[in-house]
Design a protein with these regions (language model features):
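Short, conserved loop/helix-junction motifs that constitute active-site signature segments
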Residues: 1-3, 36
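Short, well-ordered coil loops that connect the C-terminus of an alpha-helix to the N-terminus
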Residues: 3, 65-66, 176
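NAD(P)-binding Rossmann-fold cofactor-contacting core
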Residues: 3-20
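Conserved acidic residues
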Residues: 7, 41-42, 142
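Glycine-rich beta-alpha junction loops
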Residues: 13-14, 49, 168
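Phosphate-bearing ligand-interacting subdomains
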Residues: 17-75, 79
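Structural signal for interior beta-strand "rungs" in well-ordered beta-sheet cores
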Residues: 72-182
Length: 182
């Protein structure tokens, strides 16, 4: 968030236990409705992969409907090709390699140390845990989850809502709603 100042933390109303965190005010979600100058703020939805990323997706869509814009977090110690495209509300931790012509759509989380090969597309609301390898020319659907040390062979298509387990190797196209474990 190098060019952004954190103004508030916002949590669902029933989770507000304190008035601030690290000196930054915490506001209940219901107070977002009271913010008039919504273009003055950018939002980042920091929820994890629960329920195949659908909890984060739902909150992202709720806030988007309110008219807010979003920012992404990209760690300074990641390599991202200047020919890659990163969407909004993406969380990209350290030691990533994101090669040329990669498209990472909205609300995608990449934990530490992943490789996304040239010309690959990662669709909305997907989560890569650590040390995942997606080879070149792959197409990854919406709401997928990749376990630690999983890998995908070149030119593979993985449809929506697929769970790739820890250490799994994907060597063929995967249909929607599948689970892949080795």
């Amino acid at each position: 968030f190098k060019n952004n100042k954190i103004s508030y933390f916002c949590v669902d109303d029933n989770y507000v236990k304190e008035s601030n965190f690290e000196g930054i005010p915490i506001i209940p979600y219901s107070e977002l409705l009271n913010i008039k100058l919504r273009n003055d703020y950018k939002v980042f939805v920091a929820l994890s992969y629960k329920n195949m990323n659908k909890v984060r997706e739902a909150k992202y869509k709720q806030i988007k409907k309110l008219g807010f814009t979003f920012t992404s977090f990209i760690h300074k110690n990641s390599y991202i090709s200047d020919k890659a495209t990163i969407g909004e509300n993406c969380f990209i931790l350290e030691n990533q390699t994101i090669q040329r012509n990669v498209i990472i759509k909205n609300n995608v989380f990449l934990w530490s140390g992943n490789h996304v090969g040239h010309n690959s597309i990662i669709d909305d609301n997907t989560y890569l845990s650590s040390h995942v390898v997606i080879s070149g020319d792959c197409k990854i659907g919406k709401n997928c989850f990749f376990g630690v040390n999983s890998s995908v062979k070149d030119s593979i298509t993985i449809k929506n809502e697929v769970l790739i387990g820890m250490g799994a190797s994907v060597t063929k196209n995967i249909t929607e709603g599948s689970v892949v474990i080795n």
